[in-house]
C-alpha cells in the first residue's frame, strides 16, 4: 500500500524521507512511501485539504486551530527544532538587553512562532518590549541573513537551518528559542512540527499509518545514532562542498529529533500554546486560547 506525504520541496523533512527510501525502511514496514514535494506552505495545506496527499508536515498550532473549526485532523511529533537569535561576533551584543535600539531581522512574518516566543521571553524575563525597543525588519530568510553579513542589521531571528548557515560563516548564536522556553519555565521538548492526517482516514487505514509512523521513528533513530546515514544527504543538504555547514546542519537537525510521541510532549505543547495564544492572539491560534484536547493522536 502507498502513502502520499506532502512536504515542502526544499524542506529539511526530505532528509528523513530520503533516508527512509534509500534504506528500504518503508518496504521493510510493508508500504510504499510516495513523497510529494510542494512549493510552499499554502500549496502543502491545499494538497492536504484537497485530498491529494494523506499526510503533511505542519505545526500543532495549525492542527489545533483546524480542530476548533470542526476538522478531525491529528498530529504526531516530528521535530522540536526551532530558531534563535544570531549576531555578528563583532557586534558588542552579549545579552538580549543589548538589542535595545538595534535592528533585528525577523524571518516568517509578524505571527511567526519564534518571534511570538521571543516577545513573550523578552517581556517576562528581561522586561523588554521588543516591538517598541528594537527596530524590526521582517524579511525572507536568505535576505535577512545577507543583511546581517553585510552589517546592515545587528541581529537576526531566523529558522534553525538558516542559522546553521550563519554559524558556518562565523556568526554566533546569542540565544536559542529552546533556551528561551526553558528560562520561561516551559519545556523545550515541545514538538513544533509533526505529521498531520485525518483521524477518520487513520481509522480506515490503521495498519498503513502505523507502518508509516514506525518507519519515521526508525529513520529518526538512524539519523540520530549513525553518522554514516548522513553521507548520502550531503547533496540534498546543499552542503557537499562545505564541511563546516554540513556539520552545523547535521548537528542542529539531530538536536531537534523527536524520538517518540509521548503524553509529556503533548503537555509541553499545551503550555507553549497558551503563551503563544497570549502574545500571538487569534491571528496565530484562531478562536481558542487553549490547545484542542485531541490534537495529539493518542491512539499511536
Describe each model-derived feature in a short phrase:
Residues 14, 18, 45, 60-63, ...:
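Extracytoplasmic/secreted envelope proteins and their assembly/folding machinery
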Residues 1-138, 154-160, 174-177:
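Short, glycine-/small- and polar/acidic-enriched structural segments
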Residues 202-281:
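Secondary-structure end/capping motifs
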Residues 28, 178-188, 255-269:
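Short, solvent-exposed loop/beta-turn-alpha elements that line the ligand-binding surface or hinge
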Residues 23-24, 51, 151, 256, ...:
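Short glycine-centered helix-capping/turn motifs at secondary-structure transition points
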Residues 270-300:
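Conserved C-terminal helix/tail region of periplasmic/extracytoplasmic solute-binding proteins
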Residues 60-61, 137, 142-235:
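Pocket-lining segment of extracytoplasmic ligand-binding domains
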